[in-house]
Amino acid sequence: MGGKLIVFEGVEGCGKTSQMQLCSQWLESLGVSVVVTREPGGTELGLHLRRLLLEKAEDKPVAEVTELLLYAADRSQHVEQELKPNLAAGKYILCDRYTDSTIAYQGYGRGLNMSLINQLNYIATAGLESDLTIWLDIDVEVGLTRKRGDGIALDRIEQETIAFHRRVQQGYAELAASYPSRIVRVDGSLSKEAVQQVIQEILRVHLKGLP
């Protein structure tokens, strides 16, 4: 059975982490070898970049293009160190965010040049695309309310304006419309159990070779 890259995307508080954990447990119960990872922060270098990207610094804000380049650096290291080797070993990779996040957040959210973003994504990934992307679609205000309810301080991106997060959401909607064979929308407002059931059905349909 060949390796597969399955990406989970969505706005803040959409439930990616919980659904990835449930999906990993399900796949492992089928005898599938699973790797769970994330961007940013899927490598040792990435952990340092994650801190730089997400910590709030009022007096020294991260410039928007700098932010874009840091995400690209994290992704390049992640692809070479984690994604390619594990795919070659036949593993199923569940990845929390990938290239679509950069398009949605830095492209739609920040308004940066989309051509530049696409070029950087291609350079960072060497053309490696996901086999399937699960987009957990939830209203941005509901998602942010969930995040605040976690009792953990919001990071720099989570503290952006509602308008920013709505632009990000629009980015995901347009990406899903543009790449329907790769990106599948899941209603993230359903119960955790219902969302997981839908995800399992999607994986069985889209990924051949599951036991």
Swiss-Prot record:
Gene3D superfamilies: P-loop containing nucleotide triphosphate hydrolases. It catalyses: dTMP + ATP = dTDP + ADP. GO terms for cellular component: cytosol. ATP binds at G10, V11, E12, G13, C14, G15, K16, T17. One of its GO terms (molecular function) is dTMP kinase activity. InterPro entries: P-loop_NTPase (IPR027417), Thymidylate_kin-like_dom (IPR039430), Thymidylate_kin_CS (IPR018095), Thymidylate_kinase (IPR018094). The lineage of its organism: Bacteria, Bacillati, Cyanobacteriota, Cyanophyceae, Nostocales. It comes from Nostoc punctiforme (strain ATCC 29133 / PCC 73102). NCBIfam families: DTMP_kinase (TIGR00041). Coiled coil: none annotated. This is Thymidylate kinase. It comes from the Bacteria. GO terms for biological process: dTDP biosynthetic process; dTTP biosynthetic process; dUDP biosynthetic process. Keywords: ATP-binding, Kinase, Nucleotide biosynthesis, Nucleotide-binding, Transferase. Phosphorylation of dTMP to form dTDP in both de novo and salvage pathways of dTTP synthesis. Belongs to the thymidylate kinase family. Its EC number is 2.7.4.9.
